[in-house]
Amino acid sequence: MQFSGRTRKKLRLAGDQRNACYPHSLQFYLQPPTENISLTEFESLAFDRVKLLKAIENLGVSYVKGTEQYQSKLEAEIRKLKFSYRENLEDEYEPRRRDHISHFILRLAYCQSEDLRRWFIQQEMDLLRFRFSILPKDKVQSFLKDTHLHFEAISDEEKTLREQDIMASSPSLSGVRWESESVYKVPFADALDLFRGRKVYLEDGFAYVPLKDIVAIILNEFRATLSKALALTARSLPAVQSDERLQPLLSHLSHSYTGQDYSTQKSTGKISLDQIDSLSTKSFPPCMRQLHKALRENHHLRHGGRMQYGLFLKGIGLTLEQALQFWKQEFIKGKMDPDKFDKGYSYNIRHSFGKEGKRTDYTPFSCMKIILTNPPSQGDFHGCPFRHSDAELLKQKMQTYKIPASGISQILDLVKGNHYQVACQKYFEMTHNVDDCGFSLNHPNQFFFESQRILTGGKDIKKEASHPETPQHKPSTQKTKDATSALASLDSSLEMDLEGLEDYFSK
């Protein structure tokens, strides 16, 4: 598959050539990849990178960055997803290749809005910080050179000459063996953050920065480089979106869900309608608890609320017949004529179960879909309370849910940092009296099933393991066969020419 008029080429490298492509376990991603990959690998790499960045976000708010626990858990995530992380491991070509290609694929998806760019940059910075923290000291200078950062380590003589001044100006050197610490001579303009914090020694327009502090400068350079690159990529979006081979893969990537498929559960039919009120206070996430309360009080929900809540109920086990009965009973309480419900609303419910129209069996919305699409307006109750409620209203809601003041403060801090899913996870821990829930929350139905697992010991409602599914709707059998056949046909005859992608990242 070719994106430009460049001559196609496929890398066939071995030995030293392979190592030369990726000399380090970390990089600034200055050059786009130039090889061909299949559509299947393109998609697989993209979703693996999304999983990694979401894991980085969750770990970053659950643990102090740089601590032993944070480092070990992040290393485990990177290893599990087969990305590069250590400098001196053998057979690192493939993990570094995966890292390189997947980063550039996600640029295409995450350049589309300011919020997406900000989130992407932050997670990539945290990943770079981790990798730099475990980079051997003897590799730092070559990494800086390859990244075009002209920071030279000063000689031992210069260190000795300025030892007292540097030690007095650099708090990070407290308790560090001076003899083993490298110090870098950096232009003053590149060390402004350290200067503002009075954490660096200045002389003749240069800052003398210990290795422990150089990471702050490297991260600033990386942020500026990546921010500019994303802006350039955003200019090429119309061309990317017009490509029928790329557009389907990128359209939902930024808010895709990569976990459990909650469209069909073994618990189907095990939930009775008279259980819903009780379950809503015990096991519903705030977004669904809010919708249930609004439905009971107003006997009506607008379309966005009906879709979000209806698919959630379907995912926790309501059958089509139960769903029709549930919604009809509630809407009739609101003085709706039963015939009007049967002729209009019942069709939409059957449609969501794949029984009408295109026979698309819709799956419950993931957290990312709720957070990033269809924001609520006046009179709506759908959306994510942590994302779409102002701080005071959210505080009142948490008080109503009997969250202690200290817990509310933690939740509001997470929301202020745009960590909406982690805030919901903290709510889960508070309401279920657990210190660490042991999972990363990505789906309202995941919240429900994890809650039931704790409350019932997994005896009643138990989710079954299934393959991850990323779309928010499941096509009919025939459409699935057609799509699979089409993709197989594309894979057999065409490949992604990543060399041509350079045009999207540099124009």
From Swiss-Prot:
UniProt feature, compositional bias: Basic and acidic residues: 461-472
Q: What is known of its domains?
A: The RNA:DNA duplex-binding domain interacts with the template phosphates at positions -2, -1, 1, and 2 positioning its bases -1, 1, and 2 for duplex formation. Interacts only with the beta- and gamma-phosphates of triphosphate moiety of initiating NTP of the primer. The side chain of His-303 mimics a RNA base that would be paired with the template nucleotide at position -1 via a hydrogen bond, thereby facilitating the stacking of the initiating NTP. The interdomain linker provides flexibility in movement relative to primosome platform composed of PRIM1, the N-terminus of PRIM2, the C-terminus of POLA1 and POLA2. Together with POLA1 interdomain linker, allows for large-scale conformational changes of primosome and coordinated autoregulation of catalytic centers of PRIM1 and POLA1. It is proposed to move the C-terminus of PRIM2 close to PRIM1 during initiation, then move it away with the 5'-end of the nascent primer during elongation.
Q: Which InterPro entries match?
A: DNA_primase_lsu_euk (IPR016558), DNA_primase_lsu_euk/arc (IPR007238)
Residue segments, region Interacts with PRIM1: 266-503
Biological role: Regulatory subunit of the DNA primase complex and component of the DNA polymerase alpha complex (also known as the alpha DNA polymerase-primase complex) which play an essential role in the initiation of DNA synthesis. During the S phase of the cell cycle, the DNA polymerase alpha complex (composed of a catalytic subunit POLA1, an accessory subunit POLA2 and two primase subunits, the catalytic subunit PRIM1 and the regulatory subunit PRIM2) is recruited to DNA at the replicative forks via direct interactions with MCM10 and WDHD1.
Name of the protein: DNA primase large subunit
The organism is Rattus norvegicus (Rat)
One GO cellular component assignment for this chain's record is: alpha DNA polymerase:primase complex
